Amino acid sequence: MLLYRGAPAGPGAPGCGLARPGGGPQAFGIRLSTMSPRYLQSNSSSHTRPFSAIAELLDNAVDPDVSARTVFIDVEEVKNKSCLTFTDDGCGMTPHKLHRMLSFGFTDKVIKKSQCPIGVFGNGFKSGSMRLGKDALVFTKNGGTLTVGLLSQTYLECVQAQAVIVPIVPFNQQNKKMIITEDSLPSLEAILNYSIFNRENDLLAQFDAIPGKKGTRVLIWNIRRNKNGKSELDFDTDQYDILVSDFDTEEKMTGGVTSELPETEYSLRAFCGILYMKPRMKIFLRQKKVTTQMIAKSLANVEYDTYKPTFTNKQVRITFGFSCKNSNQFGIMMYHNNRLIKSFEKVGCQVKPTRGEGVGVIGVIECNFLKPAYNKQDFEYTKEYRLTINALAQKLNAYWKEKTSQDNFETSTVARPIPKVPDQTWVQCDECLKWRKLPGKIDPSMLPARWFCYYNSHPKYRRCSVPEEQELTDEDLCLSKAKKQEQTVEEKKKMPMENENHQVFSNPPKILTVQEMAGLNNKTIGYEGIHSPSVLPSGGEESRSPSLQLKPLDSSVLQFSSKYKWILGEEPVEKRRRLQNEMTTPSLDYSMPAPYRRVEAPVAYPEGENSHDKSSSERSTPPYLFPEYPEASKNTGQNREVSILYPGAKDQRQGSLLPEELEDQMPRLVAEESNRGSTTINKEEVNKGPFVAVVGVAKGVRDSGAPIQLIPFNREELAERRKAVESWNPVPYSVASAAIPAAAIGEKARGYEESEGHNTPKLKNQRELEELKRTTEKLERVLAERNLFQQKVEELEQERNHWQSEFKKVQHELVIYSTQEAEGLYWSKKHMGYRQAEFQILKAELERTKEEKQELKEKLKETETHLEMLQKAQVSYRTPEGDDLERALAKLTRLRIHVSYLLTSVLPHLELREIGYDSEQVDGILYTVLEANHILD
């Protein structure tokens, strides 16, 4: 144990051992570790490339506690020395924060707005700046103070320092005067003596290069040189770029091809363009803006995949696609907290592409679950990292296999063309820095250098106040991937089905007897609006209700599926069951703007135990229901005959669909028997076959065996229920349900005309028919009003959305103005006292100045008076008497000079050099000497 001199050495001595937590330095008594200045050079050697050192300086500007919007990288010539400068418009630093930044291992970065800081070790600036050059000056301002800090190996070598010394000088940002601290004067002297600025004014002039009232500027000189004495960075080849020196020579020496080297390895402009996964700031390299890009959105033939590590609960998105620039640049781009760590990492078939496997494919992944290395150029080689690389290899191989099988090309780099335009085009607004997705495929090279939101062709995203377009989450990607796999399986299953010939009824359907038809009165049917005319009814279910119930259609009553055709008797039962299990029940849409839609009747297929033993020819086809639209005259009393609708006939099914322009009219439902005949079938067969029960059979007619008459179910109960519904709800449950009674009554009237042998009163039926007509007309009016109200509601909703967007815009502008006003306050509240003191001092100085002004005025008056007197005396001197006076004064002056010489010789200590001989001072001195020596007595 090493102790300070004078510290107790015994083990039991008081004060020995480790210090207590919170104790001061006086309680330690143990030597502190020191850091040699040579550590600055050894620490910088962790960066194998100069661009990674530059990335460290850019990371400090991107971190959420700085939030710089613009970074300028430039090369300047100061005193014949090339200097590399980095300037940002961030928050700046106080002298205390600057001291922590120039120290080692101190970091207090926080998470803001779900943005994680990139730096975690507190070492990036030291290692990055010393990797680029030997000396660095930091200029920072935060709205109140200007601070200069020096980190220089040259200075430490000249003063032969034993530790790392960082001179820091603060200045007042208002008057640019140095703030006196205990080390400000020696720090300023050290900076002026050992930096490239030897005057204080030159030092302060560097703050003018920082845009705005806050920001930081880093100036690095003595740029690192190679062994041949040439600068490591090439500033001369490209005036708008910074290149790595002699990269062509290195490639030729290794035997490689120059084009195969990624541009990001030797061009700083290309490196800055992909440094961040989603850039949030503008970078100007040598006074020209860098075209930053989201590399995941700059690929063609993009496919998304997910990776769920076993050591974390979060899924990670992986993006695969083909490069649109150079197919020889391929691999995995691995990011961490939005920052590029490894670029073009070869995995899977890309490691040894014997026949061009994986060439041109780029993968993008953000590995926040991995730990980056100390220099942020690689990840720590752990088990998690190896598992991630293996998973990436498998997924890349699967992507390559899928794309090669789709495109049907040979695995050769020559056979596959390079896509020129990515699948999506994203561009960053130059003002709000938000990313906007442009509709269609647009070549990014055709866009202007400065793009703004109001250039967007999409009207929704033409303002900077509108948030960015939301991307798919990892959960959505998983669902879409699973859905895609299911669609692939379904397509494979449907391929043999499409080759089969769909069968139709070969024999005419049979008519049920009266007794068998009466057994169908216990069945119900529902209707639902169908948007597409190609949608066919495919199934239904039985209802245990004894009569027709006018209710809102329940999802359990019938099921639709637009993906399947009817498969009839000869098809295997297992296939029919599989199709029925895959059917989905669409929900009713009561918010449709049009009140009337096509309505087709779904047919129920109840499957019995022996249903597969009967062929389709043994089944009967009951009356089917379909919409009949009125003509232009709207003659509701005339019922038109329609053709028989067979569910298996494609041409008849298409013929039942009327033109689109008649969709806004009320349909009348007409019941038709499929085929009138006297053939009877077994009742058990009817239960097994498809059926739809819409109308009932009169009891008297059923018992007598007369021809069938169709009447609606429960007419009285239906009328009472409609009256009750209209009393509290003007909108009907369903258009089809409102049309059923009218159509059924029409069928009843026609049935009565055909069966003249019965004595049913026609007058009562006619009254009921007229009443139902009036009810239908009333429902039509109510529906028309409902549509009008819906249109007004939509207009009000659009107006509300418009004013809401305007309110958000004004609110955003208010926030901007309040922020600018807050920034305009040059001094914070803690400086108010200092400002008040300065005001009092200036006020006192003003009072003193006023007093001096008054005194000067009085002296001016006295001088003017004396001048007038002299002018008068001059006039009197011109007379003869004046000439005598002048001669007398001259004699008196000579006499006084002689007396002064005499007094000087007698009294050597007298100083008579500055005495005026025109005044009476010499006379007074002579009188004093004579009186002191008692000569006058």
From Swiss-Prot:
Residues 606-637 are annotated as: Disordered. The keyword Nucleus applies. One of its GO terms (molecular function) is ATP hydrolysis activity. This is MORC family CW-type zinc finger protein 4. Zn(2+) binds at C429, C432, C453, C464. InterPro entries: HATPase_C_sf (IPR036890), MORC_ATPase (IPR045261), Morc_S5 (IPR041006), Znf_CW (IPR011124). Histone methylation reader which binds to non-methylated (H3K4me0), monomethylated (H3K4me1), dimethylated (H3K4me2) and trimethylated (H3K4me3) 'Lys-4' on histone H3. The order of binding preference is H3K4me3 > H3K4me2 > H3K4me1 > H3K4me0. Keywords: Coiled coil, Metal-binding, Nucleus, Zinc, Zinc-finger.
